[in-house]
Amino acid sequence: MSNIIKQIEQEQMKQDVPAFRPGDSVEVKVWVVEGSKKRLQAFEGVVIAIRNRGLHSAFTVRKISNGEGVERVFQTHSPVIDSIAVKRRGAVRKAKLYYLRERTGKSARIKERLNRVG
């Protein structure tokens, strides 16, 4: 029984999800239905948390919009998500960046992660 469920979940999972970590700035394009119209909406911000649970994986993106902090949780393999693009790599030491909720301005900045050559 368990193998059948795993097989079905594997078929439902997206294969084109880019590798990103907490601290990275990402742009998530989401399909939004307004009345009879369907359009793409971009949500760009910093990944503050990732929850890896196979098909049920999710990640939280935080951005500042008009001086107000906005967080949105996305299901990684949801059909509502059109694309995920990594804009900038961030260097952080924690897996959950919930401390950014209390910070504003320069203290909320994240250093850019530089990849080693070698």
Curated annotation (Swiss-Prot):
Any one cellular-component term (Gene Ontology): cytosolic large ribosomal subunit
One GO-annotated biological process of the protein: translation
Name of this chain's protein: Large ribosomal subunit protein bL19
Functional summary from the UniProt entry: This protein is located at the 30S-50S ribosomal subunit interface and may play a role in the structure and function of the aminoacyl-tRNA binding site.
Annotated keywords: Ribonucleoprotein, Ribosomal protein
Record lineage: Bacteria, Pseudomonadati, Pseudomonadota, Gammaproteobacteria, Enterobacterales
Protein family membership: Belongs to the bacterial ribosomal protein bL19 family.
PANTHER family linked to this entry: LARGE RIBOSOMAL SUBUNIT PROTEIN BL19M, RIBOSOMAL PROTEIN L19
